[in-house]
Amino acid sequence: MSKRGRGGASGAKFRISLGLPVGAVMNCADNTGAKNLFVISVYGIRGRLNRLPSAGVGDMFVCSVKKGKPELRKKVLQGVVIRQRKQFRRKDGTFIYFEDNAGVIVNNKGEMKGSAITGPVAKECADLWPRIAANAGSIA
């Protein structure tokens, strides 16, 4: 769970099961032209020997585009996780998971590069990132 370095995030972040370790590839859910995002590192993870840093819903991470527009590929970018397949527990006791892992490309202030998001955005992510919530079609 990232505790530091969440750029434009607002509010407190609760413990969420981390489902996307370094090396994971997820869908890009915005309209920037990127198809896949490859996780390079996760902001705010201090870590432990031999443990891979992992990201969960609402975490900001460093990524690169593996498939998509040529002008986005082979560059180091920032992204935020908006959905994950690994289930996590909400404060009301319910467990939730999504059918895919997805993220969006943001700048270091937390503002989206794209202008629209396909599919739902987790409520935990929308609470932390107001600019992502503004572009979300639905919040689950």
From Swiss-Prot:
Q: Does the record bear Cell membrane in its keywords?
A: no
Per its UniProt entry, which superkingdom is the organism in?
Eukaryota
By its UniProt entry, which PROSITE patterns does this protein fall under? Answer: RIBOSOMAL_L14
| Cellular component, GO annotation | cytosolic large ribosomal subunit
Q: Which SUPFAM superfamilies match?
A: Ribosomal protein L14 (SSF50193)
Question: Which biological process terms from the Gene Ontology are attached to this UniProt entry?
Answer: translation
Q: Which UniProt keywords apply?
A: Ribonucleoprotein, Ribosomal protein
GO MF, one term, reads: structural constituent of ribosome
Could you confirm whether the keyword Ribosomal protein appears in this record? yes
What does the similarity note say? Answer: Belongs to the universal ribosomal protein uL14 family.
The protein in question is named Large ribosomal subunit protein uL14
